[in-house]
């Protein structure tokens, strides 16, 4: 994957197979998927048949007709070539992924004893099987870690050489078939049968086997078909005008007029643009499950961003212990450390380290203490330990206060007095206003104080949000922090809004509320609790390090598990829509120059006054093309060559700029609208001069 990210737009390894692919795509069943080019192929075949008739009978201008036929077929082949190049880039990526898919032997476990396993082919594994994967082993299929912790090399999938940690019981429990365990061991429950793994899906999607036309593509195809029908009718009426004028226009000339006027440029490149949009995401190490998801990213109105890891660096560290009145710092530190002994989060580990550094409190063995760890959940927003009838909890201030109130009522114990609660709230507010996160700590219903966690806003993130605002995108920060902390960080980062103390249900409600207003929403997530929101969002980006449920729910997967990529994904989506719109504008604008090339050539000999060699319609020959035949031939040659010239742009995409919609429209109309008029005038004139100089017409 990493090699492919930097490959050239027109790589020789892709171009050569694409030449053969262009001819294979002449199959009518393949051409029928592109209505415009299918019509071009039909009229090319018709003209070829008429040429053979004239060749046998000796009628017509065989030399001129043959040149028109050659360039008509080149038009079809160039369109096929553009699609074949785009598909070839996907196939090259798929070949790279296939190298990661190796036949492996799996250590199938029948019971709890790790030493008793049976070696079986990885392809024979069924969903629900439990396998042992030890250091040096290849993980045989997708699964969920049910026991153990290990360092895993996922370079075959992500292209990232740094190993990652996979462990049971958290949001880092999902493992991917084809990756390798570097150290320790894990027990894995298989979640995908052979042929249906994440790697298989990646290969299928990257190759384009599952690519379907998006709604925008279908709508544009309908427009192009409509325009084609209009030009069919317009062309069909011309022989009547010619007959009325006492002249004759050959079928070859009518076909040339028809092909140059219909939107062949965008018709030829439309499929390549769609494939290239997904390809650009893959090169960015993001896998889109459909072209619809890429398009939706370009139309996003609201962006939901997790605070931790996206807006901030995500490594919150404990910096201070702030006890309430009547409690010593050491007592607070001891309780906070005890509640964090089994907490493997960066925050939990930093509390243990800070307690040791400040007060020499050493970590204690949970097994010796006979302690039961209470893990953090999105619902309780607390964690802690229970030891011999005693409990210690740390977490969000409101959650800890609610827990203390509930536990004292249940045990008929004395509730904390109002002064202590006010003191705790004052400390928490002070921490929150400084941009920190307050963690309240209690022991057996007694409030002890607050641990100050400090995070840092990423550099340059404020400018990124300003760019999104120019695009018309509203940014919302999602955080579990209290409203004061959230407000301080939101102001520092420059987001438009925030949702504090957010639960998975809150995220889902926010997405539905935005969608009810007609907005398209994008978000990212990695946990099982994010799955409903990922499924509901128009663009749901699941982290590759996340759970199986999250990856199944999202319509994109970020192989690098970098939440900040959501911003780039939106930009890639907008670039796809801009490329399609810009080339459509360019294609339609081309017709103006082609009109001034072919119409005068067709009617130059009509309505000729006595003593004149040309008629009044010759005045439309503003390009001063040499002869009617050279004018028609030049237009048909330009029509074919412009497809080849625009292939790199269709694959690379039009660069998106973070400016207002009005300014962006004006700029694109100037570049691709006016440019679409000027370029054909210049191109057709140059080709006409070359055709005349070579004596081709």
From Swiss-Prot:
This is Potassium-transporting ATPase ATP-binding subunit. It holds the Pfam family Hydrolase. The system is composed of three essential subunits: KdpA, KdpB and KdpC. Belongs to the cation transport ATPase (P-type) (TC 3.A.3) family. Type IA subfamily. The keyword Cell inner membrane applies. Mg(2+) binds at residues 526, 530. One of its GO terms (molecular function) is P-type potassium transmembrane transporter activity. Gene3D superfamilies: Calcium-transporting ATPase, cytoplasmic domain N, Calcium-transporting ATPase, cytoplasmic transduction domain A, HAD superfamily/HAD-like. Its EC number is 7.2.2.6. Part of the high-affinity ATP-driven potassium transport (or Kdp) system, which catalyzes the hydrolysis of ATP coupled with the electrogenic transport of potassium into the cytoplasm. This subunit is responsible for energy coupling to the transport system and for the release of the potassium ions to the cytoplasm.
């Amino acid at each position: 994957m990493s090699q492919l990210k930097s490959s050239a737009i027109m790589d020789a390894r892709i171009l050569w197979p694409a030449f053969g692919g262009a001819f294979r795509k002449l199959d009518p069943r393949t051409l029928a998927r592109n209505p415009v080019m299918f019509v071009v192929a039909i009229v090319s075949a018709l003209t070829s048949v008429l040429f053979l008739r004239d060749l046998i009978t000796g009628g017509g201008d065989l030399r001129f007709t043959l040149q028109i036929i050659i360039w008509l077929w080149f038009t079809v082949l160039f369109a096929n070539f553009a699609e074949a190049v785009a598909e070839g880039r996907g196939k090259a990526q798929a070949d790279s992924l296939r190298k990661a898919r190796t036949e492996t032997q799996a250590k199938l476990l029948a019971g709890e004893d790790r030493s008793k396993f049976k070696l079986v082919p990885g392809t024979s594994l069924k969903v629900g099987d439990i396998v042992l994967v030890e250091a040096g082993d290849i993980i045989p299929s997708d699964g969920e870690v049910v026991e153990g912790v290990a360092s895993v090399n996922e370079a075959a999938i992500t292209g990232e050489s740094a190993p990652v940690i996979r462990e049971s019981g958290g949001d880092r429990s999902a493992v991917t078939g084809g990756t390798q365990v570097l150290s320790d061991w894990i027990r894995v429950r298989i979640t995908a049968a052979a042929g249906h793994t994440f790697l298989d899906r990646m290969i299928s999607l990257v190759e384009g086997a599952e690519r379907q036309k998006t709604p925008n593509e279908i709508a544009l195809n309908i427009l192009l078909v409509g325009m084609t029908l209009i030009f069919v009718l317009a062309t069909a009426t011309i022989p009547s005008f010619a007959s009325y004028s006492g002249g004759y226009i050959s079928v070859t000339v009518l076909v040339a007029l028809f092909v140059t006027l219909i939107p062949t440029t965008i018709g030829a490149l439309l499929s390549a643009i769609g494939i290239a949009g997904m390809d650009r995401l893959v090169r960015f190490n993001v896998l889109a499950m459909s072209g619809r998801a890429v398009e939706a990213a370009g139309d996003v109105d609201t962006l939901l961003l997790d605070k931790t890891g996206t807006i901030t660096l995500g490594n919150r560290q404990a910096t201070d212990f702030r006890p309430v009145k009547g409690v010593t710092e050491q007592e607070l530190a001891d309780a906070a450390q005890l509640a964090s002994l089994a907490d493997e989060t960066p925050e939990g580990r930093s509390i243990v380290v800070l307690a040791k550094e400040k007060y020499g409190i050493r970590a204690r063995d949970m097994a010796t203490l006979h302690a039961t760890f209470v893990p953090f959940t999105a619902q309780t927003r607390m964690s802690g330990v229970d030891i011999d009838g005693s409990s210690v909890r740390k977490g969000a201030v409101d959650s800890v206060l609610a827990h203390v109130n509930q536990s004292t009522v249940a045990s008929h114990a004395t509730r904390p007095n109002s002064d202590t609660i006010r003191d705790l709230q004052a400390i928490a507010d002070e921490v929150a206003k400084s941009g920190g996160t307050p963690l309240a700590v209690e022991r057996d219903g007694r409030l002890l104080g607050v641990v100050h966690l400090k995070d840092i806003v990423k550099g340059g993130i404020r400018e990124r949000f300003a760019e999104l605002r120019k695009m018309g995108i509203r940014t919302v920060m999602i955080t579990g922090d209290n409203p004061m902390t959230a407000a301080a960080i939101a102001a520092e980062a420059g987001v438009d809004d925030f949702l504090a103390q957010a639960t998975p249900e809150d995220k889902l409600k926010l997405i539905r509320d935005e969608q009810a207003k007609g907005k398209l929403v994008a978000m990212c997530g990695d946990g099982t609790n994010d799955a409903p929101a990922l499924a509901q969002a128009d663009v749901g980006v699941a982290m590759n390090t996340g759970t199986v449920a999250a990856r199944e729910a999202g319509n994109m997967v970020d192989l690098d598990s970098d939440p900040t990529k959501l911003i780039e994904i939106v930009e890639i989506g907008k670039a796809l829509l801009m490329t399609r719109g810009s080339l459509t504008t360019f294609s339609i604008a081309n017709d103006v120059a082609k009109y001034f090339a072919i119409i005068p050539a067709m009617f130059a000999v009509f309505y000729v006054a006595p003593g004149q060699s040309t008629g009044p319609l010759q005045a439309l020959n503003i390009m001063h093309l040499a002869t009617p035949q050279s004018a028609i031939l030049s237009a048909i040659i330009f029509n074919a060559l412009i497809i080849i010239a625009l292939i790199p742009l269709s694959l690379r995409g039009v660069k998106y700029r973070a400016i207002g919609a009005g300014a962006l429209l004006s700029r694109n109309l100037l570049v691709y609208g006016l440019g679409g008029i000027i370029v054909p005038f210049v191109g057709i004139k140059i080709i006409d001069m070359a055709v005349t100089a070579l004596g081709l017409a």
